[in-house]
Amino acid sequence: QRQMCIRDRGGTILGTSRQPFKLMRVPDKDGIDKVEAMKHTYHKLHLDCLVILGGNGTHKTANLLREEGLNVVTLPKTIDNDLWGTDMTFGFQSAVDIATDTIDRIHTTATSHSRVFIIEVMGHKVGHVTLHAGIAGGADIILLPEIPYDIKAIKNVIDKRTQAGKRFTILAVAEGAISKEDAKLKKKEYKEKLANRKYPSIAYELAEQIEKETDKEVRITVPGHTQRGGTPCAYDRVFATRVGAKAAELILNEEYGYMVAMRNGETVKVPLEEVAGKLKYVDPNCGLIKEARTIGISFGDEV
């Protein structure tokens, strides 16, 4: 009965917190070791198992607790779809639907004005949401963290569309999109550059560059945390139900230390130590990228 009440709710039912993994073993201001505190609570409550839902950071912590002797089973929950070992994560498709709807709505107004429109989509390190929403929404240019862009290539696409009589150009841009010049910087140098950047995000930096290169007006839309909220789509409800049922099966069989994954349409168990700390990036040479290029979508990398 409880499950029926929450199947159409997004977010976290029990609540959550953000704790950087690198600080898990660092005592807080009260001198409390967070890992030891979790172990103490686990045993105090006489728990059989911890079922942990989350993304990359969550799985690193879950694996740490496994190494500390706790019984753990995890579920892949993140809009980024960046967890290694699973084809899909729940939350991803709902976020793609929201981002796609945003691009669709921009198309409606874009047809009336000779402008460039930038939709900034969530994704700091990986571009799965941007890639799928960009294709589904009919973006002309898609910029991903995995494929550094060249502003000249973007200019060329806009110019060619203008010459062909197109009145607008739409860019789907991951918030972690990076230029070819910045991609050459060392990690520390790039972080310092971001810290000193005058723009609130990549979309605003791109907008200024595009206006300078093309003399086009640029408008920016940032759907932001709307991509993380609202009612989960039907796909995610079914997906979450399936991996949840598989997790219950593992617990009943006392099989601990696994993430429940989806591979080739089937729920499977993947050892946590194989998942923790690994990101699933967009492969620049994957079929989806190649197919997108075939239908004329630019990734801002070809001048």
Q: Residue spans of the language-model regions?
A:
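Short, small-residue-biased leader/transition segments that mark boundaries at the very start
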Residues: 2-6
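Accessory alpha-helical/coil subdomains and C-terminal extensions
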Residues: 41, 49-54, 62-64, 92-111, ...
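N-terminal glycine-rich phosphate/adenylate-binding segment common to multiple enzyme folds
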Residues: 21-72
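Acidic/polar active-site rim loop that often engages polyanionic ligands
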Residues: 75-88, 111-112, 136-137
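C-terminal non-catalytic interaction/assembly regions of soluble proteins
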Residues: 198-303
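Short, ordered loop/turn segments at secondary-structure junctions
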Residues: 18-19, 55-58, 70, 75-82, ...
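Short beta-strand elements at the ligand-binding edges of bilobed clamshell
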Residues: 85-96, 231-237
